[in-house]
């Protein structure tokens, strides 16, 4: 079955209670239309004020650190690039971090961890968090949610932490870790002890949806908590999902895909006694043959035998959207992590898409093999669109929506309970495009379905709101035409099907303007790094000890030359004395 995200008529649903894992009615809408799981009804900074991050400094006015030092804020970014921090950054309660507003290739936080310790009601979207080995503490996590509750993390890349990429532990019932969702995120390349995620809290709740755990020795995740683990993928792990504990917890482990990479050697699923487990539809691929052709997998018990449930312990598993394991692989490799990809994530996704041929467990940033910026790669800055009243919404969006570009009206409540700036950041956080009214605009559906490109995808379009949608003769271009005299938000649905019986259904959100499109803004196709990235030239070593190859983002070997390749992003791989070195190459 296909899965649909973000249908606006289905935005409001019941909230999840914090006790007895039940549900209660909610007057507020979801954190954002695609929000799922225990953290779905977090409100973040809704109703507070807007804070602009205006520089890449470690601290001071306009810095990210200052932005999250007080609660009741929606944080937007007027700059893109890398923020190097010297110490941990503490995020306060009642905050929305809208990383999708950053121009260019977005924002990356390097040099230290982010922490939500003892805080609550937080939304974090489109943020790259990469401490590296020179962080202030060798035991730093990337994102630490200790003693936190009611947090949702979406479309983030959490990598290169010396302890765990994700931390979320508590031994205190007064500050239990609960009401957490992590979705659509990339959790990769932990260094030091090389652990993916350590989650531990008695009576806590945690949901994982559509995430990728990549190049990680162990704890992918280690969940000593009541959890829902649905439609995630693991690649190149030595130990996968684990629950090594004597304390009783409930686990729903459904339709996940586990694929061995060069380091893979253990069963994916390690359970102990005293655990209650519902496991269904999970797949494992051990053959490293470059194809997604795994087999059904059952529970592997590490110490003792737990209770195997006949149905899910939590209703989220039965009521939420769900893909088959293979379709989840295709979706996650199409849209998870921070979009557009920067150099590090381009390398990680290339390794994933080789399906067993590439990838390594790394001990340092340099071990990844990137040859740009001392191994860190680059994150292109870009330029923010004009925002005359500094309310966080650019003028082009306010004009399209009929708002006042000379008045700070960001927190004015709109339909379905969202405030106006949430309308903007929710549009920007989805697959989206812009169009002038009464003018057709084409959208290349391949740009948001990369994971399906190896299985001869077939597309269909339907359910246009405030306009019409047609699939063009090439089979992948969707042409949207808005209604006459309409401006504001429109949308259409698309479905992609692979020849391996995989399928996904999603929506593209369309902003229809009254006048010509403001060229200073980037839509989801123009934000794609394969189009916007300008790379420096580089020289390949040419001696007998060096093996060179050019690969596309799906891991396919293309030869030794880029001369006849079409426009796009490629990986150049050099094997020098047994060590892989990489360069992200973009052909304009």
Where are the model-predicted features located?
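Acidic Gly/Asp/Thr-rich repetitive segments characteristic of extracellular carbohydrate-active
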Residues: 30-75, 553-559
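C-terminal tail/sorting-segment detector
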Residues: 503, 507, 517-521, 569-588
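Right-handed parallel beta-helix
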Residues: 94, 99, 120-131, 147-163, ...
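Surface-exposed or secretory-pathway low-complexity segments enriched in glycine-proline
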Residues: 440-481, 506
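Extracellular beta-rich repeat passengers
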Residues: 222-370
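Extracellular calcium-associated, cysteine-rich motifs in secreted modular proteins
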Residues: 370-432
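A short beta-strand micro-motif common to beta-rich folds, especially ectodomain repeats
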Residues: 486-500
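Extracellular beta-strand-rich solenoid/capping regions of secreted or surface-exposed proteins
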Residues: 65-71, 82-98, 105-125, 131-148
């Amino acid at each position: 079955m296909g899965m649909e995200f973000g249908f606006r008529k289905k935005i409001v649903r019941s909230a999840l209670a914090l006790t007895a894992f039940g549900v209660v009615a909610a007057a507020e809408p979801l954190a954002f239309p695609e929000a799922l799981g225990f953290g779905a009804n977090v409100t973040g900074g809704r109703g507070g004020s807007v804070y602009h991050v205006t520089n890449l400094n470690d601290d001071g006015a306009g810095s990210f650190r200052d932005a999250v030092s007080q609660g009741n804020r929606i944080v937007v970014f007027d700059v893109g690039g890398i923020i190097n921090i010297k110490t941990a950054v503490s995020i306060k309660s009642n905050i929305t971090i809208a990383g999708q507003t950053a121009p260019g290739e977005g924002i990356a936080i390097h040099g230290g961890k982010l922490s939500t310790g003892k805080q609550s009601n937080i939304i974090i979207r489109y943020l790259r968090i990469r401490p590296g080995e020179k962080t202030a503490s060798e035991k730093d996590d990337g994102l630490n949610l200790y003693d936190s509750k009611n947090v949702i993390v979406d479309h983030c890349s959490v990598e290169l932490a010396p302890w765990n990429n994700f931390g979320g532990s508590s031994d205190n019932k007064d500050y239990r870790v609960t009401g957490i969702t992590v979705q659509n995120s990339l959790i990769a390349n932990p260094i030091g002890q090389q652990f993916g995620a350590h989650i531990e809290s008695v009576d806590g709740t945690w949901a994982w949806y559509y995430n990728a755990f990549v190049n990680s020795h162990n704890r992918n995740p280690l969940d000593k908590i009541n959890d829902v683990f649905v439609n995630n993928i693991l690649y190149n792990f030595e130990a996968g999902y684990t629950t090594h504990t004597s304390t009783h917890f409930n686990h729903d482990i459904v339709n996940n895909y586990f694929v061995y990479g060069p380091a893979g050697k253990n069963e994916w699923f390690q359970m102990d006694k005293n655990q209650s487990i519902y496991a269904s539809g999970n797949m494992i691929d051990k053959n490293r043959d470059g194809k997604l052709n795994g087999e059904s997998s059952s529970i592997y018990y590490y110490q003792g035998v737990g209770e195997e449930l006949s149905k899910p312990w939590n209703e989220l598993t039965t009521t939420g959207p769900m893909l088959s394991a293979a379709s989840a692989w295709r979706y996650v490799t199409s849209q998870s992590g921070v979009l557009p990809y920067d150099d590090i994530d381009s390398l990680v996704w290339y390794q994933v898409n080789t399906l067993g041929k590439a990838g390594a467990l790394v001990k340092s940033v340099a071990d990844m093999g990137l040859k740009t910026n001392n191994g860190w790669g680059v994150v292109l800055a870009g330029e923010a669109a004009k925002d005359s009243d500094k309310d966080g919404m650019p003028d082009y969006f306010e004009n399209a929506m009929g708002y006042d570009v000379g008045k700070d009206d960001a927190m004015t409540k709109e339909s379905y309970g969202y405030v106006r700036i949430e309308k903007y950041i929710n549009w920007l956080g989805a697959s989206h495009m812009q169009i002038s009214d009464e003018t057709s605009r084409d959208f290349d559906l391949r740009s948001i379905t990369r994971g399906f490109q190896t299985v001869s995808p077939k597309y269909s379009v339907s359910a246009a709101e405030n306009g019409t949608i047609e699939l063009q003769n090439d089979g992948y271009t969707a042409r949207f035409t808005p209604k006459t005299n309409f401006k504001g938000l429109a949308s259409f649905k698309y479905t992609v099907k692979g020849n391996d019986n995989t399928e996904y259904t999603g929506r593209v959100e369309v902003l229809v303007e009254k006048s010509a499109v403001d060229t200073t803004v980037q839509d989801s196709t123009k934000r794609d790094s394969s189009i916007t990235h300008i790379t420096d030239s580089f020289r390949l070593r040419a001696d007998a000890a060096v093996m060179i190859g050019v690969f596309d983002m799906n891991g396919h070997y293309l030869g030794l030359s880029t001369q006849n390749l079409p426009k796009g992003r490629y990986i150049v791989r050099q094997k020098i004395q047994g060590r892989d070195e990489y360069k992200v190459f973009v052909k304009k």
